[in-house]
């Protein structure tokens, strides 16, 4: 973190490094105030043991416990405990369920793939209240293993019972890395996406479930995910947070502006923008095939980008958003380009705020949930990495550089963001941590 004396117009000359140091203290529930998704793995009892880790054979009484030769699962850290506790609060689940774009797209995806779910065995990774597990049971699943480490699993079991589905939906309170399921599964479903797609690192548990239990040729929903980025102009945000200090009830408080910039723009901001804020076509940062991605690939993601500004405007930072696609085993994701949608139903944004959106024309088309600025709003919104000071860009001006997203070494659920960008002969670096 910079001291006030070193801060000059947001940059040291033309190459200013804006650093945010990792918190070296222990976690607290407030550390996960941004968390909007369910936990995916199992909570460690504060006394040191794993809480409520179940074997399916013990619960069903159908199979004898199987000994495994797998390597030991990763330890459950204090950060994990705090993360799991944050998902025991009903408010997080209420917000997710009330997100109609999210919940209705998942239900539609389940029904679209009903022929692959009916009579099959399903695992719901990070089941939360159990709503997706119940959707799968309603679609005719033979059995659904609903796995969650948070104490919300206790309520999920009651929800399942109240809906008369206890014979089909088995709630397992524990980490995916620790619980035992003594059979292979046909389908994995999970709403694992965090802000900026990879925040919270929940995808790792989906990969673990896939490698432990999914049959060859099985179905994973969603099947693919793509993270995008684009430069933006957002003068209203800057005016509201920074220019406000120029005149406060007739008092010159401009001395507050440098501190205000640090406080407002030091960390990534989760907020909603519109297509009118976007200066160029988006670029792909990372495309994920959930059937093939390896856990090691999530440690660090680096992408280079090159944008051509399509208008003259102040550039205030970069916006990030994602799409996820629900394709069946025989489907292929649509080709990724910076100027076309990733799949039918997703959208690409023009700098004028217009949207190229392809609707699904038949049931075999891939279903897409998009969090782009021009798609229906979701609780994910968009993630913005703001500059401390805007950069004026001209029409057709090139903006290029690279972005690296990496898991914090101390707490993998936090995400380090290293952003390099240059334009008109000036180069900059912005570093921050998404907590």
Swiss-Prot record:
The lineage of its organism: Eukaryota, Viridiplantae, Streptophyta, Embryophyta, Tracheophyta. InterPro entries: Arg_MeTrfase, PRMT_dom, SAM-dependent_MTases_sf. GO terms for molecular function: protein-arginine N-methyltransferase activity. Disulfide bonds: none annotated. Residues 80-418 form the SAM-dependent MTase PRMT-type domain. This is Probable protein arginine N-methyltransferase 6. Keywords: Methyltransferase, S-adenosyl-L-methionine, Transferase. Its EC number is 2.1.1.-. It comes from Arabidopsis thaliana. It is an enzyme of class 2 (transferase). S-adenosyl-L-methionine binds at residues 93, 102, 126, 148, 177. PROSITE patterns: SAM_MT_PRMT. Arginine methyltransferase that can both catalyze the formation of omega-N monomethylarginine (MMA) and asymmetrical dimethylarginine (aDMA). Belongs to the class I-like SAM-binding methyltransferase superfamily. Protein arginine N-methyltransferase family. PRMT6 subfamily. Pfam families: PrmA, PRMT_C. The active site is at residues 191, 200. Residues 1-48, 333-377 are annotated as: Disordered.
């Amino acid at each position: 973190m910079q001291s006030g004396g070193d801060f000059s117009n947001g940059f040291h000359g033309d190459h200013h490094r804006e650093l945010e140091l990792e918190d070296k203290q222990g976690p607290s529930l407030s550390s996960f105030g941004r968390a909007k998704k369910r936990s995916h793995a199992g909570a460690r009892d504060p006394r040191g043991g794993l809480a409520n880790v179940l074997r399916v054979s013990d619960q069903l009484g159908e199979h004898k416990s199987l000994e495994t030769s797998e390597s030991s699962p990763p330890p459950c850290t204090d950060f994990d405990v705090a993360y799991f506790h944050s998902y025991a609060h009903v408010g997080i689940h209420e917000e997710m369920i009330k997100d109609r774009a999210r919940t209705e797209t998942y239900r539609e995806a389940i029904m679209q793939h009903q022929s692959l779910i009916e009579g099959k065995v399903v695992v719901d990774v990070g089941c939360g209240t159990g709503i997706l597990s119940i959707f799968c049971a309603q679609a005719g699943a033979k059995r659904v293993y609903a796995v969650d480490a948070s104490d919300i699993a206790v309520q999920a079991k009651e929800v399942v019972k109240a809906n008369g589905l206890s014979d089909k939906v088995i709630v397992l309170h524990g980490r995916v890395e620790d619980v035992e399921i003594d059979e292979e599964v046909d389908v994995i479903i999970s709403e694992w996406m965090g802000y900026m797609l990879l925040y919270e690192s929940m995808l790792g548990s989906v990969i673990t479930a896939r490698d432990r239990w999914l049959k060859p040729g099985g179905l994973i929903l969603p099947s693919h995910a793509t993270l995008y980025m684009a430069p933006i102009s957002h003068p209203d945000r800057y005016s509201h947070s920074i220019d406000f200090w120029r005149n406060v009830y007739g008092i010159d408080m401009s001395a507050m502006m440098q501190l205000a910039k640090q406080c407002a723009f030091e960390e990534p901001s989760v907020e909603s923008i519109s297509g009118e804020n976007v200066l160029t076509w988006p670029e792909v940062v990372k495309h994920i095939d959930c059937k093939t991605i390896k856990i090691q690939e999530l440690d660090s993601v680096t992408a280079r980008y090159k944008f051509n500004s399509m208008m003259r405007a102040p550039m205030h930072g970069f916006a990030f958003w994602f799409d996820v696609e629900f394709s069946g085993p025989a489907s292929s994701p649509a080709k990724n380009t910076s100027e076309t949608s990733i799949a039918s139903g997703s959208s690409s944004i023009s700098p004028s705020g217009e949207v190229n959106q392809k609707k699904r024309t038949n049931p075999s088309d891939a279903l897409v949930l998009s969090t782009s600025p021009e798609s229906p709003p979701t609780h994910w919104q968009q993630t913005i990495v703001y500059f401390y000071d805007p950069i004026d860009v001209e029409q057709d001006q090139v903006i290029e550089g690279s972005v690296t997203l990496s898991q914090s070494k101390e707490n993998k659920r936090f995400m380090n963001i290293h952003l390099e960008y240059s334009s008109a002969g000036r180069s900059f670096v912005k570093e921050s941590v998404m907590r």
